């Protein structure tokens, strides 16, 4: 055994004299000394081998010249498509950028080439949002006017050579070919509003050219209210919600109910007469209110 001696010869003789025998098994101190010796040998040799091999690999990596195909790919690529200039890459010999020219070009073309499926999905989402807004808002609501105003989005490539302009206006679509790519886009009118304008600017500035915006001039004048209506009668009915005026009185004998809108009076008057003009198409049931008929129609779906 390669064990460091922890006792002298005199200590061993004294141990034999006192106990009558000498144990051949190593003690805890001898085991600890052996472990320290093995660790010291390991730490002196093993890291030196790793450092030598790592240094050799590092020297080969730093001093290796880049392949000529990579240099040609850097020269042929547009400098705007690369985050660093090709001249800097040539000067710094310590940096070896391993890029595949075909892979880089294919990824660049894929990122710059809009597919027809993505454009169709974009148009379908806008159409679905427009249908949801029109079905949930009354015809004179200002939220509907915001979504009916044409919204445009410009998709430009990195180098600025190919520009696709998408204008969604009520679902009138046509096919436009730009750079050999067929894209579904809307027809832009002659007086189209620029895409940089906001919704309020489009509603106000485009009122001269778009006939629909000319109608939306009836705005509520009360503080904090931004309601916009296409008809003056709708605006007057809305303003009565601020003033509390109820000019429509029920003419039924003994009824003192008053209403701010004429349709509310008509709906109330059916309670006296018992009229039910709204009939279900699937059954024989009739209703006095259209919203009650709509709730009933959901049962047949």
UniProtKB/Swiss-Prot annotation:
Transmembrane segments: none annotated. Widely expressed. Detected in the cornea epithelium (at protein level). The keyword Iron does not apply. One of its GO terms (molecular function) is DNA binding. GO terms for biological process: axon guidance; axonogenesis; dendrite morphogenesis; glucose homeostasis; negative regulation of adipose tissue development; negative regulation of insulin secretion involved in cellular response to glucose stimulus; negative regulation of transcription by RNA polymerase II; positive regulation of DNA-templated transcription. Belongs to the krueppel C2H2-type zinc-finger protein family. This is Krueppel-like factor 7.
């Amino acid at each position: 055994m390669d064990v460091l001696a922890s006792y002298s010869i005199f200590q061993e003789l004294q141990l034999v004299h006192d106990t009558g025998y000498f144990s051949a098994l190593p003690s805890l101190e001898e085991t600890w000394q052996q472990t320290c010796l093995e660790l010291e040998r390991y730490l002196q040799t093993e890291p030196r081998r790793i450092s030598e091999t790592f240094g050799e690999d590092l020297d080969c990596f730093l001093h290796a010249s880049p392949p000529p195909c990579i240099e040609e790919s850097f020269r042929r690529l547009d400098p705007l498509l690369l985050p660093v200039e090709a001249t800097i890459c040539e000067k710094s010999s310590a940096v070896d950028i391993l890029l595949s020219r075909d892979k880089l070009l294919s990824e660049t073309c894929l990122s710059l080439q809009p597919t027809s499926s993505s454009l169709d999905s974009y148009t379908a989402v806008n159409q679905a949002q427009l249908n949801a807004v029109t079905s949930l808002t009354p015809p004179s609501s200002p939220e509907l006017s915001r979504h009916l105003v044409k919204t445009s989005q410009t998709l430009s490539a990195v180098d600025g050579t190919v520009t696709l302009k998408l204008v969604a206006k009520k679902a009138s679509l046509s096919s436009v070919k730009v750079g050999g790519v067929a894209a579904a886009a809307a027809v832009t009118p002659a007086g189209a509003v620029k895409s940089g304008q906001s919704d309020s600017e489009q509603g106000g500035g485009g009122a001269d050219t778009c006939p629909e915006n000319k109608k939306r001039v009836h705005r509520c004048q009360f503080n904090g209210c931004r309601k916009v209506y296409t008809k003056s009668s709708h605006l007057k009915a809305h303003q009565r919600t601020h003033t509390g005026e109820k000019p429509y009185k029920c003419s039924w004998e003994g009824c003192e109910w008053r209403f701010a809108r004429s349709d509310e009076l008509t709906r109330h008057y059916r309670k006296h007469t018992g009229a039910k003009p709204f009939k279900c198409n699937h059954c024989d049931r009739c209703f006095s209110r259209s919203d009650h008929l709509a709730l009933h129609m959901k049962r047949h779906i």
